[in-house]
Amino acid sequence: MSLFKFVDIGINLTDPMFRGIYRGVQKHQDDLQDVIERAIQIGVKKFMITGGSLQDSKDALQLAQTNDMFFSTVGCHPTRCDEFEKGSPDQYLAGLLSLAENNKGKVVAIGECGLDFDRLQFCPKDTQLKYFEKQFELSEQTQLPMFLHCRNSHTEFLDIMRRNRDRYVGGVVHSFDGTKEAAAALVDLGLYIGFNGCSLKTEANLEVLKSIPSEKLMIETDAPWCGVKSTHAGSKYINTSFPTKKKWENGHCLKDRNEPCHIIQILEIMSAVREEDPLELANTLYNNTIKVFFS
């Protein structure tokens, strides 16, 4: 059994890829149980399943209820905030609120919410700003911490976080790829910073990672997305590999599908870059996460 203990704070277990479905087509058998088993083998103790819309949050919760190690978040991702306006925005918000309020213990965070100005083709800036701010009603009423998303929107994101400082009880900005200054400003607001493969692409990213106090860090995979690619600056620090096939085969990872077991690779990069003992860092990351989401 692994010496390491992990909480994967961002895992998209409701993604059809873990059921063998790609773009609506069944390509291989449902292997979710194998994916979970591989993660447990390397030390994942809790999985925080990300909710990215009202329906997605319902699906995440439903899956979370099938396993004691599974938990979920409730919120609306910035690229999907136009869903608020497909019917009544107040009704949509009320749906999110009742889901979070009625399932405490399984629902551990409000999110994924925030701003994403890299993908405005999915949802315009004004809509994102309006409904990110609206979701502080959820954090305020439930007193749950936040699971946050910030892409190419640091100034506006910080403005909103500062303005609503007394309406949230903490949280994490996941999949962080911002600057040292951005990280420091978020830490000043009492927030934690989550790292995954997308956070470790460039040498500049690695410099940012070095600058953040370990007691403000968390770890995640964002699987099936955000795997570490061989072109990423962080990849040279990976020691652990998994039997992987280009075409699906039982008992193997699949080449272009990230999995929660790969969290060990994120730890290896983080500990090497920061020159910290992997076990010590893993324990710090685990304790940070328990403190924010599970105590």
From Swiss-Prot:
Binds 2 divalent metal cations per subunit. Its EC number is 3.1.21.-. The modification N6-succinyllysine is found at K27, K46. It comes from the Eukaryota. One of its GO terms (cellular component) is nucleoplasm. Its main location: nucleus. One of its GO terms (molecular function) is nuclease activity. It is found in: Nucleus. It is an enzyme of class 3 (hydrolase). A divalent metal cation 2 binds at E112, H149, H174. Its cofactor is a divalent metal cation. CDD domains: TatD_DNAse. Gene3D superfamilies: Metal-dependent hydrolases. A divalent metal cation 1 binds at E112, D222. Keywords: Hydrolase, Metal-binding, Nuclease, Nucleus. PANTHER family: DEOXYRIBONUCLEASE TATDN1, TATD FAMILY DEOXYRIBONUCLEASE. Deoxyribonuclease which catalyzes (in vitro) the decatenation of kinetoplast DNA, which are circular DNA catenated to each other, producing linear DNA molecules. Plays an important role in chromosomal segregation and cell cycle progression during eye development probably via its DNA decatenation activity. Belongs to the metallo-dependent hydrolases superfamily. TatD-type hydrolase family. This is Deoxyribonuclease TATDN1. The lineage of its organism: Eukaryota, Metazoa, Chordata, Craniata, Vertebrata.
